[in-house]
Every structure is written in structure tokens, then in C-alpha cells.
Amino acid sequence: MIEVQNVKLGTLISVFFFGMIGGTLRYLLSLKLASTGTILVNLIGSFCLAFLTYYVIERQKLPAWLSTGLGTGMVGAFTTFSTFTVDILGLSTFTDATFYLLISVVGGFLLAYTGMILGIKLGKVGDRR
């Protein structure tokens, strides 16, 4: 198999293929469920990634290309919240998990706010032209 910087081409193709499926599923659910779609997608994704990580991948010993395709590709494209949740579950102490949660939520909010303000300002500059 061809390797690209120590990543096998089959794994990249798997992530791409399953990513298309996950992204498409997310889009279709958001069309059907409107405002409740996001929370449903995040909850389903959290369950799916945890299930894949802690049961299927560990117990069933799937090939690396398939487990990466399903986890990073499909669930990752379906939602990034699931990855966030599994990361917190993997931390060794409650303090570490709390710190990670606070940094993620507060940092995410601050960056979203900054992006919003920057977008508004750049949008107004574009209106003047």
C-alpha cells in the first residue's frame, strides 16, 4: 500500500469515503429536524464514537483503515462533539476533565464571538465598496 507521510493511502480513502457518508447523514438530518437536528446529531455522534472506540475497535479488532474511517471519517464528519466527549472520558482525573471542558467551552465561545465580531466588521467594510 502507498504511504503518504506514514499514512496509508487506504486509510485516507477510508476517511474520505466514510466522511462523505457522515457529512451527508448530518445534512439530511438537519433538513428533516431543523433546530433539533444539531443536538440529536451531537448526542447520536457521542454515542457512536464512544461505542466504536470502546467496544467495536477494542473488542472486534477492526483493521486500522476501517476503524479510522468509521471514527474519524464518518462520525467525525457527522459531528465533532462526539470526539470532544470521548476525549473528556479518556482523561485520567476529574480535575483534568473539568479543566478540558472549561477550556473547550469558554475557548470555543470566545473564538466564536471573535469570529462573529470579525465577520460583522468585515461584512460592513465590504458593504462600503
From Swiss-Prot:
Keyword Transmembrane helix: yes
Residues bound to Na(+): 76, 79
Keyword Nucleus: no
Topology of the protein relative to the lipid bilayer: Multi-pass membrane protein
Signal peptide start and end residues: none
GO MF annotation terms: fluoride channel activity; metal ion binding
Regulation of this protein's activity per its record: Na(+) is not transported, but it plays an essential structural role and its presence is essential for fluoride channel function.
Recorded catalytic activity of this chain's protein: fluoride(in) = fluoride(out)
Function of the molecule: Fluoride-specific ion channel. Important for reducing fluoride concentration in the cell, thus reducing its toxicity.
Parts of the chain that traverse the membrane: 9-29, 37-57, 74-94, 100-120
Entry's Gene Ontology cellular component terms: plasma membrane
Top-level lineage group: Bacteria
Family per similarity comment: Belongs to the fluoride channel Fluc/FEX (TC 1.A.43) family.
UniProt-recorded name of the protein: Fluoride-specific ion channel FluC 2
Protein's cellular compartments: Cell membrane
Key words, A-Z: Cell membrane, Ion channel, Ion transport, Membrane, Metal-binding, Sodium, Transmembrane, Transmembrane helix, Transport
InterPro entries noted in UniProt: FluC
Gene Ontology BP terms: cellular detoxification of fluoride
Phylogenetic placement of the source organism: Bacteria, Bacillati, Bacillota, Bacilli, Lactobacillales
